[in-house]
Amino acid sequence: MPRNQGFSEPEYSAEYSAEYSVSLPSDPDRGVGRTHEISVRNSGSCLCLPRFMRLTFVPESLENLYQTYFKRQRHETLLVLVVFAALFDCYVVVMCAVVFSSDKLASLAVAGIGLVLDIILFVLCKKGLLPDRVTRRVLPYVLWLLITAQIFSYLGLNFARAHAASDTVGWQVFFVFSFFITLPLSLSPIVIISVVSCVVHTLVLGVTVAQQQQEELKGMQLLREILANVFLYLCAIAVGIMSYYMADRKHRKAFLEARQSLEVKMNLEEQSQQQENLMLSILPKHVADEMLKDMKKDESQKDQQQFNTMYMYRHENVSILFADIVGFTQLSSACSAQELVKLLNELFARFDKLAAKYHQLRIKILGDCYYCICGLPDYREDHAVCSILMGLAMVEAISYVREKTKTGVDMRVGVHTGTVLGGVLGQKRWQYDVWSTDVTVANKMEAGGIPGRVHISQSTMDCLKGEFDVEPGDGGSRCDYLEEKGIETYLIIASKPEVKKTATQNGLNGSALPNGAPASSKSSSPALIETKEPNGSAHSSGSTSEKPEEQDAQADNPSFPNPRRRLRLQDLADRVVDASEDEHELNQLLNEALLERESAQVVKKRNTFLLSMRFMDPEMETRYSVEKEKQSGAAFSCSCVVLLCTALVEILIDPWLMTNYVTFMVGEILLLILTICSLAAIFPRAFPKKLVAFSTWIDRTRWARNTWAMLAIFILVMANVVDMLSCLQYYTGPSNATAGMETEGSCLENPKYYNYVAVLSLIATIMLVQVSHMVKLTLMLLVAGAVATINLYAWRPVFDEYDHKRFREHDLPMVALEQMQGFNPGLNGTDRLPLVPSKYSMTVMVFLMMLSFYYFSRHVEKLARTLFLWKIEVHDQKERVYEMRRWNEALVTNMLPEHVARHFLGSKKRDEELYSQTYDEIGVMFASLPNFADFYTEESINNGGIECLRFLNEIISDFDSLLDNPKFRVITKIKTIGSTYMAASGVTPDVNTNGFASSNKEDKSERERWQHLADLADFALAMKDTLTNINNQSFNNFMLRIGMNKGGVLAGVIGARKPHYDIWGNTVNVASRMESTGVMGNIQVVEETQVILREYGFRFVRRGPIFVKGKGELLTFFLKGRDKLATFPNGPSVTLPHQVVDNS
């Protein structure tokens, strides 16, 4: 399955729209829809059909899956066919009961048995009591045989001595067409059984009638009637094939939509899951939840807030661990900067594994310092034990680096237990951090510790309950802060033998590393020295399996809602990691999704009105009504076929009636006009634009569609009615019956065929897929009502004369001709008719078929509305997933630079994998608030320090808001360290200060290359002005101490599992020293930086040489400002937060 692991790419825009297109062959816009690797081949098993109607999916596995899906969809329609069969049995029972006699007993018994069998089959199918294999493969043929047997039984038993070529032809036509719209079989078997049924029915009727007529055989009349039957059957089969094709095409599109929607949702869900995992690897879950909740607030709600949102929480009784690499300077001198970063990356990745094992929350990585907390966010009683075990494991882990690198590196670990304020400050580049006096103590515990030992405070000692042997730490002798505060310290000697047992009892082994190795396993040590690959990426010799925290991140999270389905999409995404290579796996997932979708009863009574089936929600009904049905032109073409077959049948019955030819020509022309107007919207390139616009308007306007459909059926009905009324010219009344019936080729020879033509009109009506079932009911009532009116009134004597002649020819008991003009069931003895008069039986047949087709139309509309709701549901789910993905994306890109986040949202990264980029010319800035430490107190008036941090959050947030200015778009906030703000310029890859794709350095002048450094200097000045505005409004006197430098750095991420973006290099070290050795209220730079910035109009004051640790004497300057004429030559002026504009 193709995957796109980036952010909002353009090609996804179409997939989030409400109109999701799927293209099939013969679509006018084929090639526009997204079919990915799926194609539809114009070939199939039914070779008798035109090539464009033979659709087959490629690959074959998908076609097999579709056939299974299609047959499942037709399972309900199989029940419809059972209902049809039951109605036919009821018809036979009524017809026999009305004129009951002893010779009707057999026919009545067979019909009764058939009705019972139909009811049993209905119950078995409805309740799902039959195996699927039987229901889909055996039951359709059983039902076909049962219906065929019932038709022949009725034919043989009910018309035993008076057969005619028209007997049961109407029912045969009805069921042949029903096979195509209900049986869950492929098209070829349906065509075969339909042809077999029609051939056998025709042969049986022809032979039987010929034998009964014997010496009085009317060969031409029988031949014409047999040919009329054939054309009726051919029409039913042709329209049935078209209906099957239309249903197949509709279901294929629904199937492709389901597959592609599943694929899109899996892509989105997987990306959203990656974003969530990445986010939760940087932020604790409770903080991320609160951030997402606030991000979804309306702008009006945000504007009502007096202060910027601060996500800060108090956590008591936690253990804080600080660990620092001793001898890091010696180690850094032994390898290059890139090799050093790679080494740190592998070492800290190992520490992250240990942190997961010992329930630690890694807070930050500061250079070579690693610190974490246990008991946050979820409290643990054994937090102190876990932290000490973590410290011991870190000391042992660094020993392997010491052995392999032959250097004196070691770990100095300090642990303190107390209270912290945990959260994030500012509005950009969020990083979780903790603040409190106890954090400071923990930091000093590390600074006052001894290399290779774990140094703990008295508060931590009080939580241990004797699990470890300790000795006095005497931390005050090595750290003035500890001595000043009078903090007793201890050094862990070694864990007792019971420690392992204690750790097990405390659940440590429950979250051990997946490979089950102990923290000091030597199996992982080679990875710590395999860091000198020339391509700049580090790899471990072993594979990395699923991590505990990754499993935790995948737990149910109410802030990251997934579609509320039994088959959760994140489960699908997890199970189809390599779906592009494993088509079978994706098809299995699709099958599960389709099964679940079918099992969900989407259309319920509470959603739709019972009678009309319209949605109760008017807006939903409007959306459904404008759904475009592209097969409407095909439906009108079926009307043309029906009219053609109608004309052929009527011409065969009465070849001398000129009205037949006139109605056919006029009706066919009118129907062709309607068909062309409907096809114009489907094939816009083949028709004039005005006709296409008119056709499109018809398709999208409900009343116009209904009117167009009514016109088509009205034409069919009127053609039949006009022919029936015109035929009356041959009939001159009962007195001239002999002469009237002697006219060979008259429609009076067999008036039943005009009712069979009405059945074709009913079939044409249900083919109108663009109208609702209520409109179809209206049209079918028009057809049935017109036929019934003519049968019972205009053609009443015609049918009576037909019955009279038929019974007379076969010497059957009958009433006098004058008595036949009014059917009276009260007649007895030999005067009782052996059959129900044709005028009644034909009328009942037409109405019963109308009811059957109406029942089927309701089923089709229910299915159409269900598919519509599924489509809306899929769209809404994709929108929800996409919306959550957008919020996750916003959070992730607010924690990592976008190009870095893209990298980590790709395929799963190994823990030791290093992402890094080298930059030769960037600017680095550190800006601190030295006097904030004096401002911070944890007194109750300040809510334990939270209010002090709230004020710091306002300052940092205002600094962050400066970055929204286009002038500072090339400036990247790296992080905040306490009250120190770190930023860099020029670290955005492939983009220069003007926002265009960068070219080679040789193609740009020095002024162009260092414009970003000037922007960074402007940013530092804007920060000073912003702080001045804050001081004026809050009556404070905070001052910034800023240091800047320029040069080359290595930017990258340490720890693929918990990515920490940072920059390293001598440039960063010097910039940090410029800040720490600077003077409050000033921006200090070295001479090389001053020379470059001076060219941009910045003013400097020479400070002179100062001593910098590790660098010796450096000549420095204070940046005082910029000439007004040179201010922001390439951008607009900057509006400062909290700026008070003087308009006087």
Swiss-Prot record:
Keywords, alphabetical: ATP-binding, Calmodulin-binding, cAMP biosynthesis, Cell membrane, Cell projection, Cytoplasm, Glycoprotein, Golgi apparatus, Isopeptide bond, Lyase, Magnesium, Manganese, Membrane, Metal-binding, Nucleotide-binding, Obesity, Olfaction, Phosphoprotein, Repeat, Sensory transduction, Transmembrane, Transmembrane helix, Ubl conjugation
Keyword Transmembrane helix among record annotations: yes
Placement of covalent cross-link Glycyl lysine isopeptide (Lys-Gly) (interchain with G-Cter in SUMO3): K465
SMART domains reported for this sequence: CYCc
Positions of modified residues (Phosphoserine): S525, S580, S1076
Top-level EC class as recorded in UniProt: lyase
Physiological role: Catalyzes the formation of the signaling molecule cAMP in response to G-protein signaling. Participates in signaling cascades triggered by odorant receptors via its function in cAMP biosynthesis: specifically activated by G alpha protein GNAL/G(olf) in olfactory epithelium. Required for normal sperm motility and normal male fertility. Plays a role in regulating insulin levels and body fat accumulation in response to a high fat diet.
Record: disease: Obesity: A condition characterized by an increase of body weight beyond the limitation of skeletal and physical requirements, as the result of excessive accumulation of body fat.
The protein's name: Adenylate cyclase type 3
Organism: Homo sapiens
